[in-house]
Amino acid sequence: MLKIIIPTMMLMPLTWMSKPNMIWINTTAYSLLISLISLSFLNQLGDNCMSLSLLFFTDSLSAPLLALTTWLLPLMLMASQFHLSKEPLARKKLYITMLILLQLFLIMTFTATELIMFYILFEATLVPTLIIITRWGNQTERLNAGTYFLFYTLVGSLPLLVALLFIQNNMGTLNFLMIQLWAQPLPSSWSNTLLWLACMMAFMVKMPLYGLHLWLPKAHVEAPIAGSMVLAAVLLKLGGYGMMRITALLSPLTSFMAYPFMMLSLWGMTMTSSICLRQTDLKSLIAYSSVSHMALVIVAILIQTPWSYMGATALMIAHGLTSSVLFCLANSNYERTHSRTMILARGLQVLLPLMAAWWLLASLTNLALPPTINLIGELFVVMASFSWSNITIILMGTNIIITALYSLYMLITTQRGKYTYHIKNIKPSFTRENALMTLHLMPLLLLSLNPKVILGPIY
């Protein structure tokens, strides 16, 4: 594991020691190398000593998320160049350092062996994210968004700490590998119900569950581009990862406790998709679509069958790349028109034909068109929930239709129609942006050729 963690740490001195004209090139190139190293953790045997130590370990659930995290850093750096071009040098370096620090915390969170260690790192990711949102966001509402983000996550995860300490006292260990061997079945009683809620609530807020999702659109809309990308692509996955890990402790109780949360997720999924149809703000629309996709993942994890777990892991990876590319496209519009309102930036197909192609591809991946990995994830989740209960297909089907509707609505509003006069002389799309979109969409298509590397621990 150190072969990823130590190079990531050394990216920080690299940033501060680089010449001013080499900052972006150096950090992007080296972070890309690190992300290529992390690919070696995919598809490995479960029992090799490479992936196991007392502090960090990878298995087939954390390896795909680890690869996603490391893959995202070079993409975030590529996306932020224009956004920071007018900032002074020290501030650019600080921004890059914050991204690297966040990356470091995320890598360690996904590979921690102990639940307390996982909790500490889970909370540590808040600090760089908060600084990125509140320091480099675009509007003054970013302070409000930062407060929402911080307090929702903190209040949600405090009971988890108490629950973990209680479990530590009872079991004597919180090691992930020991838990799977030693976990005692939890009978349903009042105290165990509260324990279950305390363990799950932190991750439900992070996912976010419908009803606890108010921080997400705010944080997404106000964050700078790299903040939005890492929030959508990796921070939401912490919730899913934590839920999958901690259900080993709560085994028989989950099947009894999951009903209200599954109903809420299924209902919230349809509701947030419908909210997307009413949005005027482009980033807000993408944020709400994230909520609806993550609701699918919550349902899949709570069903707790091997099939649904595979669907959940595939969907998490797919959603990470898809929402990230959509935020990049929204940002490229924002950099040219200085507005997130879709009606003000319409008809861009005439002016940016290549960007329109990227918009089309991104919208189609968002509505889970084959041959993308999104389809595989959604298909698995829908089939697993259908075999769990036939009635869920009503809400699932409705959600799939509404997803197609808002994806096409977003595409048509931004690309079609008569363009407004204030955007006649905008810049053409840069090579940097085209490379960025390619690096997002390539994995989505390539993974569908060999999906077993991201289908999680059960495959």
From Swiss-Prot:
It is a multi-pass membrane protein. InterPro entries: NADH4_N, NADH_Q_OxRdtase_chainM/4, NADH_UbQ_OxRdtase, ND/Mrp_TM. It is found in: Mitochondrion inner membrane. GO terms for molecular function: NADH dehydrogenase (ubiquinone) activity; ubiquinone binding. GO terms for biological process: electron transport coupled proton transport; mitochondrial electron transport, NADH to ubiquinone; mitochondrial respiratory chain complex I assembly. It comes from the Eukaryota. It catalyses: a ubiquinone + NADH + 5 H(+)(in) = a ubiquinol + NAD(+) + 4 H(+)(out). The chain crosses the membrane at residues 22-42, 60-80, 98-118, 147-167, 194-214, 224-244, 255-277, 284-303, 308-330, 350-370, 391-411, 435-455. It is an enzyme of class 7 (translocase). Its EC number is 7.1.1.2. Its main location: mitochondrion. Keywords: Electron transport, Membrane, Mitochondrion, Mitochondrion inner membrane, NAD, Respiratory chain, Translocase, Transmembrane, Transmembrane helix, Transport, Ubiquinone. GO terms for cellular component: mitochondrial inner membrane. Belongs to the complex I subunit 4 family. NCBIfam families: NDH_I_M. Core subunit of the mitochondrial membrane respiratory chain NADH dehydrogenase (Complex I) which catalyzes electron transfer from NADH through the respiratory chain, using ubiquinone as an electron acceptor. Essential for the catalytic activity and assembly of complex I. Core subunit of respiratory chain NADH dehydrogenase (Complex I) which is composed of 45 different subunits. This is NADH-ubiquinone oxidoreductase chain 4. It comes from Halichoerus grypus (Gray seal). The lineage of its organism: Eukaryota, Metazoa, Chordata, Craniata, Vertebrata.
